[in-house]
Structures are given as structure tokens and as C-alpha cells.
């Protein structure tokens, strides 16, 4: 370790040190024992357990996560070259696991999984859409964005623009303002077109959910579509229509896609037209909970394949129980509506709804519906959203396909 480092020092508890040694990148405020030097929010600090250096990270006294570790190499200098190397490493990984159209439309930076805590970057062709939930990264974004552009210039796929989707509520916990817009004052259209699994989509980077599209379900859509041939499909929580479009393109007899958002339904309809699938998909703007309840009352068993892709019902441990009830309600109703031998694709995108809890919920719903679940596939997020085993927060998506028997 270099003897002279220009950073303030903090002493952390043995519990925090153990967590860092195990590879987790967070230090909580109540794990800081003492400090040496001025602690400036957004600055880099060195973390020590006694005299043993544990890593360097961004400090924020206003956040529950007081330090987000960005390096465990004491020789690192945090300049543009550092961020260039970090981003290049992430991009080369995506070039390995995502090829062709998949690389042109994927997550480039997945926060902690790419050693850039609190930073998300999704690519839609020549547009990058970013979200920052770390004060230190926000203060260094000019250097980071230049490095991002330089990396894509090097691989011969230059970026036209960077759109900042910094309207996520998590920023308020970091003391950051909410805003969205083109970085650097650029003025490009906020609607762009992508191709995924051979399906063309219009993506609204300004108003769409997340950064405009649910990239993490890329290969789950392919898996769901594989068994859709000749099926009558009910696609619930359709958003931009992706699951339904994949099913229709793969030979489904007919698809009904449902979403409570009229804006999402209109976007999904436009995507169907874009792919010449409008005659094979009906779109319904309705609350899925109410729709399933009404179908049950009418004893409507016309669908032999139901897809449930709900938004995250919980974003904290405090609401896991109520979220579990919501997940169970829609899955129980779907199981009761399906004929024996019908198919169910179901998922949860909440980290706090663990795989164990999700499986228990599904088992409980199956018991109440008096059915058995024959598992076809158990899946997770696409590899451009990598999971680090020592950072459980990076593991959040559960996706199952069953035959109901």
C-alpha cells in the first residue's frame, strides 16, 4: 500500500471489515468507529480495521450506506483512466455474454456487480441511459461519462447521447435531486427503436419504466415463447408488450395482453403493428387483479397459458409479508383459471422476495388451488445483469415456468 494517500481515513467495526473481506461493498453509518481528517460528503475515504486497510470508497454522511467501496487495490488512482478501465472491463464482459443485437441493447453497468455501486447504465443502440444513486459518482459523472464515450469509441460503436434518468426515488436517500434529461444539453428524440429476440420495439427513455425497457427479462421472454405455439395466452402486466409479442411471433393461437397503464397499452399496440402482429394480439387496459377476479367469477377458463410479470410488490423488508399476499393472490387466481395441463409463467423482480419465499408462496398457492406444479424452467435475470454471490442484492429476479397438473 502507498504510504502517502490524499484521503481521509475511517476506522470501521470488525463486523464491517468482515463484510468487506467477504466481498460486500457497503459500510453502514453505524459501523464507523472513528475518523481522521475532514470527512466531506461525496469524497473518497480509506477504510481501516485497526491498521489494516480494507478498501476505498465514496463517503456520504447523509446516507444509511455511509461508504460505497469502489476499489480494493491500494495503488489505484481515481482519475479518468481508472473509470475507463472499469467501464471497459464491464463492456468486454457484455461483448462475451451478449452478441449481435443482444449487445446493442443491454445493461452495460449493473452497479455493485460491476464495482460501480449506485450506477446503472443501459444501452439502446447509440444511446446510453444512466441512473446514479451515489453522491460520489454524481460528483464525478463528467469524468465517468467521458470514459463511457471513450470506451464505445474504442470498440467502434460510438454513442450519440447519454440520457440521465435520475428520477428514481432512491436518489433522495443520497440527498440527490430528482431530474431527467439529455446530458450536456443535447436535444435528441426520447423515443428510440431496438430489436430484441427478433422483435422490434419502440422504447421511451424519458417516460418508460426503469430506463425505458425491462432488459433483464430478455432470455426469459425467449423461454416463455418456446411453449406458446398453438396456445391461447393471457399476458398480464404487459408494459411494452414484450412477452405477448414473443409468444405471438412464436405461433401462439391468440394473445391477450393486459396492463393498467393506458400509455403502456398504446406503446404495446404500436409495437404489435411494428412487427405485423396486431391481428394476433388483443390489448386490454385494466387492473390485472380485477381482471383475474372477474374471470374467476365468470368461470372463464379460455386461456391455457398465463404469464404473470408484475412490478416489484416490495422494495423493503418491511413490506415483504404484504407483497407475498399480493403475489399469492394473482398466482392462486391464475392456477384456478388454468385447465389441468395448462401452463403458467410467473416471476418476481424484488430482491427482498427471495427465491425461498417465492417458492413457498407458489407452493401455498398450488395447495389452495388443489393443483400440482410441474416445473419446466427455473430462471433468473439475463447475464448482462450479473449476480455476485457475495453481494446478494444483485440477485433479484425469479422466473419460473410450470405446467399446472
Identify what each model region corresponds to.
Residues 1-125:
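Non-catalytic accessory regions of SAM-dependent methyltransferases
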Residues 109-122, 141-213:
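Non-catalytic substrate-recognition/targeting regions of SAM-dependent transferases
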Residues 226, 240-253:
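Conserved SAM-binding loop of SAM-dependent methyltransferases across substrates and taxa
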Residues 230-239:
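Conserved class I S-adenosyl-L-methionine
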Residues 254-259:
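Conserved SAM-binding motif I beta-strand of class I
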Residues 263-307:
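S-adenosyl-L-methionine
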Residues 302, 329, 343-405:
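C-terminal catalytic and target-recognition region of SAM-dependent MTase-like enzymes
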Residues 304-333:
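Mobile active-site "lid"/loop adjacent to the S-adenosyl-L-methionine
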